[in-house]
Swiss-Prot record:
The keyword Phosphoprotein is annotated on this UniProt entry: yes
Species for this entry: Schizosaccharomyces pombe (strain 972 / ATCC 24843)
Catalytically driven reaction(s): L-seryl-[protein] + ATP = O-phospho-L-seryl-[protein] + ADP + H(+); L-threonyl-[protein] + ATP = O-phospho-L-threonyl-[protein] + ADP + H(+)
Pfam families noted in UniProt: Pkinase, Pkinase_C
Active site: D353
Binding residues for ATP: V236, G237, K238, G239, S240, F241, G242, K243, V244, K259
Compositional bias annotation for Basic and acidic residues: 43-58
Protein task: Involved in a signaling module for sexual development and cell growth under stressed conditions. Required for G1 arrest under nitrogen starvation and for growth at high temperature and osmolarity.
Any one of the GO BP annotations: positive regulation of transcription by RNA polymerase II
Domain Protein kinase: 230-485
Effect of S546D: Function compromised
GO cellular component, one term: cytoplasm
Entry keyword Oxidoreductase: no
Record's protein name: Serine/threonine-protein kinase gad8
Organism lineage: Eukaryota, Fungi, Dikarya, Ascomycota, Taphrinomycotina
């Protein structure tokens, strides 16, 4: 779900929907230009395929009830400044409204904080829920102190990440990238033993020094959620069905994205199945590069989805501003997206709507795939579907031809997206939709002169028109094995141990500067829905919407089994 709730082609039966021979309609994308062909270099190896199968073994698991994870970031010691980094000037001010609010010190009293903007800050992330905490004005650059306590809602298992940064003398560059230096980070696997306090010094990876962290898990009263559990902060997106608001959960102070949808509008547009599919996918999937569902609930007139608030901006926003990305940056995003799509395919889900508007960046620059309204569920490897949906410039040839399509359709759109990142436009883009469809089906794939040879070969494989010959038709591992990804350590990538090539300028969890002011300037409110006279039968279709599930604890870290409470380095 792009926060804009962008409009896409509604799913209909393909035979009556394409109309390639009818009068062309004009379609404007915004900023970009390019075209497509086949051939693939498939570096498949029996050893890698076998290893991939072993990596997907069912992990050990334990069940834990929803609860609260209390994290206290105390201090760090022996940090070192990267060579060549110019730190921010002592005493430079920052808008206090952007800083994390004072939290309880454990006894119920608010802690007064004097922030030092020029000292290292820490980004704490649990299940894609991120907070930024500035150091106290009582410490040094090498030995900063935060003495900060945060409480996270636990709705499923997730690792806890803590990354330390230091602002530079120019914190925000002209391209919107944060120039802040990475000083090191850790990743912890929390213990979910009730009321057991862990307190340890943990060595940083990617830097020098250690960080002291305390964790305590407490069960939570599982009372039904309502809109009253949230403080409405900002509107960050709108659509025909409703809107998306930035909210603060009152009991934990965590920031979320609350998507509200009017039942009557969903029913009148025959979108019930799509809406239920989105919630189903979000509830099932646990992947570091997919926006997680925290809760869902409903009222007689509305449906509500509570998701992690990812505020680094849409990839579309960054791509539009910069025109295109360098090859490494594009590779990094495509690699993380590949892992996300592979996860969906293992759940027998086809995504079908991959595009820059549906990809968000988090605080640190990792991607988060969102908007699952066009997903197709229960699609085994060889299953085919014939429905027509997606966004025009990303549609695969087999979809346009009405031949039916499989999961392999997602690899075509991955290729289109990579091409767009590198060149600035989708390969067959045209303002006339019907002419664009013709190009997708008939035109050769052409490349600008400056494209990397390995990237060309990968794109030729992904953009092969015959789906059975397309790179990835044998599974995601085929794509991972391509020479374009030779310098990617997939295990480190999945563990988010590779520093992103770009870090958005984000000041805090409530910063909305990467969102359209058209939305953020609007007063947030949960509008009253007039009596829609929905029948009991219609209401029954939403009977299982509300979601606050027990969590299955996955004690595996990619390949290796990690005991709960251990440090992941």
């Amino acid at each position: 779900m792009s926060w804009k709730l962008t409009k896409k082609l509604k799913e209909t039966h393909l035979a009556s929907a394409i109309g390639l021979n009818s009068g062309g309609s004009s379609f404007t994308r915004g900023l970009k230009n390019s075209t497509l062909s086949s051939t693939s270099s498939r570096k498949s190896s029996d050893e890698k395929s076998r290893k991939s199968s072993e990596d997907k073994r069912s992990p050990q698991s334990t069940v834990v009830q929803p609860g609260l994870l209390q994290v206290t970031i105390i201090e760090a010691r022996n940090l070192k400044l990267p060579s060549g980094h110019v730190p921010a000037n002592y005493g430079v001010s920052i808008d206090n409204s952007l800083l994390a609010p004072p939290l309880s010190n454990g006894s119920g009293h608010a802690r007064s904080r004097s922030h030092a903007w020029w000292l290292p800050y820490i980004v704490v992330e649990f299940d894609k829920n991120e907070i930024l905490v500035d150091a106290l004005n009582t410490a040094s650059l090498e030995n900063p102190c935060w003495d900060y306590q945060a409480t996270f809602d636990v709705s499923r298992y997730s690792k806890l990440s803590l990354n330390i940064y230091l602002r530079s003398s120019s914190s925000r560059s002209r391209n919107g990238m944060g120039n802040d230096a990475f000083l090191g980070g850790i990743k912890l696997s929390p213990s979910f033993i009730v009321n057991k306090l862990t307190d340890e010094w943990v060595p940083l990876h990617g830097g020098s020094g250690e960080l002291r962290v305390q964790m305590l898990y407490k069960p939570n009263q599982s009372t039904p959620l309502t809109i009253d559990a949230f403080e409405l902060l900002k509107v960050v997106g709108k659509g025909s069905f409703g809107k998306v608001m930035q909210v603060r959960k009152r009991d934990t102070s965590r920031i979320y994205a609350l998507k509200t949808m009017k039942k009557a509008h969903i029913v009148s547009r025959s979108e019930v199945d799509h809406t239920l599919a989105e919630r189903t996918v979000l509830a099932q999937v646990n992947n570091p590069f997919i926006v997680p569902l925290k809760f869902s609930f409903q009222s007689p007139g509305k449906l509500y989805l509570v998701l992690a608030f990812v505020n680094g901006g849409e990839l579309f926003h960054h791509l539009q501003r910069e025109g295109c990305f360098d090859t490494y940056r594009a590779k990094f995003y495509i690699a993380e997206l590949l892992v996300a799509l592979e996860c969906l395919h293992e759940f027998n889900v086809i995504y079908r709507d991959l595009k820059p508007e549906n990809i968000l960046l988090d605080y640190t620059g990792h991607i988060a795939l969102c908007d699952f309204g066009l997903c197709k569920l229960n699609m085994a490897k060889t299953d085919r579907t014939n429905t027509f949906c997606g966004t025009p410039e990303y549609l695969a040839p087999e979809l346009l031809l009405g031949h039916g399509y499989t999961k392999v359709v997602d690899w075509w759109t991955l290729g289109v997206l990579l091409y767009e990142m590198i060149t600035g436009l989708p390969p067959f883009y045209d303002e006339n939709i019907n002419e664009m469809y013709r190009k997708i089906l008939q035109d050769p794939l052409r490349f600008p002169d400056n494209i990397d040879e390995k990237a060309k070969d990968l794109l030729s494989g992904l953009l092969t028109r015959a789906p059975e010959k397309r790179l990835g038709s044998g599974g995601a591992q085929e794509i991972k094995n391509h020479p374009f990804f030779d310098d990617i350590d997939w295990k480190k990538l999945c563990a988010k141990k590779i520093q992103p090539p770009f870090k958005p300028s984000v000041e805090s969890a409530i910063d909305t500067s990467n969102f359209d002011s058209e939305f953020t300037s609007e007063i947030p409110m949960d509008s009253v829905v007039a009596d829609s006279h929905l029948s009991e039968t219609v209401q029954q279709r939403f009977a299982n919407w509300s979601y606050q599930r027990p969590t299955t604890i996955d004690t595996s870290d990619d390949i290796n089994t990690i005991a709960p409470g251990s440090v992941i380095r």
